[in-house]
Structures are given as C-alpha cells and as structure tokens.
Amino acid sequence: MNPNQILENLKKELSENEYENYIAILKFNEKQSKADFLVFNAPNELLAKFIQTKYGKKISHFYEVQSGNKASVLIQAQSAKQSSKSTKIDIAHIKAQSTILNPSFTFESFVVGDSNKYAYGACKAISQKDKLGKLYNPIFIYGPTGLGKTHLLQAVGNASLEMGKKVIYATSENFINDFTSNLKNGSLDKFHEKYRNCDVLLIDDVQFLGKTDKIQEEFFFIFNEIKNNDGQIIMTSDNPPNMLKGITERLKSRFAHGIIADITPPQLDTKIAIIRKKCEFNDINLSNDIINYIATSLGDNIREIEGIIISLNAYATILGQEITLELAKSVMKDHIKEKKENITIDDILSLVCKEFNIKPSDVKSNKKTQNIVTARRIVIYLARALTALTMPQLANYFEMKDHTAISHNVKKITEMIENDGSLKAKIEELKNKILVKSQS
C-alpha cells in the first residue's frame, strides 16, 4: 500500500486540526525508504521531533494494519539548512539500532557552553575511527533531564554510523523490554547477538536498569564483552555512578572506570545561543526581545524550550500572524505560572542571604551598606524574574514607599549586571539554584 494513502487514511483516527497541522504536512521520502523502513519529511526539525514522538508509532501501527507488513517509521526534517551529514547515514545501519537515532542530533547542532563543554569534549574526541573504543571508554554523562544528554549520546551515534560502525542506541526501557520479550520467546541468543556484536553501545537513562538482578547481570556481561572487543560504551543518567540506587556495586565500578562528565543547567548566554540555534536551523524568525523573554522566563529544560518554539511557530502558521512578544507571553503564560507558583520570595531571600552571609532582616531594612544594598537588589531582580509578584507587592514586602522604588532598584541592578561579568555569573548561578530547588 502507498504510504501516502496510509497518511490519508489517518484522517479517520485524528481530529481535523491534528491531521491538517501534523499529518497532511508530511511528505513520503521514497528515495530513503525501504520495504520495512518508511521515511517521511516534515517542514522543520522541531515539527519532525514532535510528530515522531506523538505519531510515529501510530503511523507504523496503522501501516501494519492496513498493509499487513511491518515497518519502522522515521520523521525527519526537510530543510535547506539541514546538515548534509544527516542525509548520509546508511539505512542498513539505522535498521540495526534498537531505536532510530534522530539525524538532527549532531555535534554541529549542539550548543557548547560552560555547563556542558567537558561532556561535549569527551564525546567529540572519541568520535573518530582511531579513537572510538580506545580513548575514553566508557563515558558516563549525568545531569538533570532536558539539558542535552541524549543529544550528545546520539551525536556520537550519528558520527559512528557515518564511519560504518554498527550502533545500538537504547533507553533502559528498550533494553529491559528487549530482554523480557526474547526471554519469553526463548530467543535469548538473538538478544545476545544483537547487543554483544555492536561497535558502539549507547544507553540512555541507565539508572532504570536497577529493576531486577537478572537484567543487571545480562547488562554486566554485555558491557564486559563489548569493552573487551574495543567497542565504545556511553551511558547517561540523572546521577553519577556512586549515587545510583538499586544498581549493583560491580556495575557502578564498571560505569566509573572511564570518563564521568556532568551537564549542569546552562547560563543565560548559553540558553540564548540554544534558542538562536533552534530558530536558525528551522527558519523561524524571533526578535531579540522574544528570545530574551523565553530565555529568562523559562527554566533550563531544553526540551521545554523547544516545545515553546514549536508552539509559537504553530500558532503563527495556523493563525497567519507574525510572532510577537505579546503572542509569546500568551503562549507561555501557563508554563511561567506553573513555575512561579513553586517559587516564593522567601526562598529567594534565604538563598541570597546565605550567599552574602547577611541577615534577612538587614536586606528587608532600609540599611544602605553596599553589600546589603546589592543583596536587596538581587532579591528584587530575581523575584521579578522568578515569581508572579507585582512591583507594588514587592514594595510592600520590602516596606518601601511605593513601586517606583522597586523600579529604581531593578534599573540599578540591570546596569550593574551589564557592566560586571562576575556579578552576572553570580546572579545566574543563584537563579539556577532556585529553579533546580523548585523542581525537586
């Protein structure tokens, strides 16, 4: 059956808006497709990722039901600016993977900053024929969700595929499901052959392997065999090896026997660079005001930021209007409200006072000592950025005459930030600590 006809038939399963906005825009890529591997092009990377996540399995299932044939489905970006490298990947190698790699996850599309440069450097260094499996092995990347761990993992995978290597990328859930399914079907030999005979093993969210001893035993032997054969192993997790719960000591020891690299929340300039990169790659035009608003109003989860950009682009496309700051504020209001409800000014005051080693009562007083004034202005600045408090409410909190005093303090601290890089970094560090605490 013609894959385009499959998409047409999906009309019956989806709402009219869903179909028109996310399915009708897909174009079947006959050149890259095979009998059991269907490739569809979407207008840009963000839409491709969204459609792959939400509708990829549905399209695959619908194709099997209608045609009687099984096929994996890949939704990829069709863009003039898309790296030519992402189109050079051999389909035969892609089919060997547990989960299809996202071709847009490359080193070129990864934004490097102080928060991730060590992890990036380690992954980039081993992505060469004479280094793979030999230089740093294994590599263990850890950090909060949504900061780019999967991007780096798959960047290594895509680079390895271009070198003709056999790559297995799997989440812990994929690995566990593979094992359970093959155990049930009496085909563990097939499972062992798949995982042990690869050149590069990429495991996402390795912390979830700690469900049963049998799963960990299987992974232990697979890990050792790949390592002994000079295969490359890279894993991601939310915590470093020594803090993984439910994982055996011998596995923790293997995980730590290489490079351990953390990824921390990005600073403001890195967040802005990430937003610009996403917009440039997808031909989406956002003004500096909108980019700065997104960067300062949202947390550090890059996937959430991408989701906002997708939503803005979708709103503008569907409504046929320009993306304005007002539209951005409207689209983002629920996200910002949810975050701000978790943060109080008392939380901010407590953290800033601890940092400056001063009393909260001094900051709330009218004392004019320089360090107290600076701390007070930082609290006001962060409260404006991270809470829903209005200027009059802040004036009341600090027992100031009216909101113009708050406005004056915001202006002064903004000027100080522009002229003092170390102060800017300190405020960004405080902001990240507050956001991380609010999400825990």
Swiss-Prot record:
Keyword hit for Glycoprotein: no
Functional summary from the UniProt entry: Plays an essential role in the initiation and regulation of chromosomal replication. ATP-DnaA binds to the origin of replication (oriC) to initiate formation of the DNA replication initiation complex once per cell cycle. Binds the DnaA box (a 9 base pair repeat at the origin) and separates the double-stranded (ds)DNA. Forms a right-handed helical filament on oriC DNA; dsDNA binds to the exterior of the filament while single-stranded (ss)DNA is stabiized in the filament's interior.
Region listing for Domain II, in residue ranges: 75-99
Subunit structure: Oligomerizes as a right-handed, spiral filament on DNA at oriC.
A molecular function GO annotation: ATP binding
Family matches, as Pfam families: Bac_DnaA, Bac_DnaA_C, DnaA_N
Domain of life where this protein originates: Bacteria
Taxonomy of the source species: Bacteria, Pseudomonadati, Campylobacterota, Epsilonproteobacteria, Campylobacterales
Residue span of region Domain IV, binds dsDNA: 317-440
Protein name: Chromosomal replication initiator protein DnaA
Source species of the chain: Campylobacter jejuni subsp. jejuni serotype O:6 (strain 81116 / NCTC 11828)
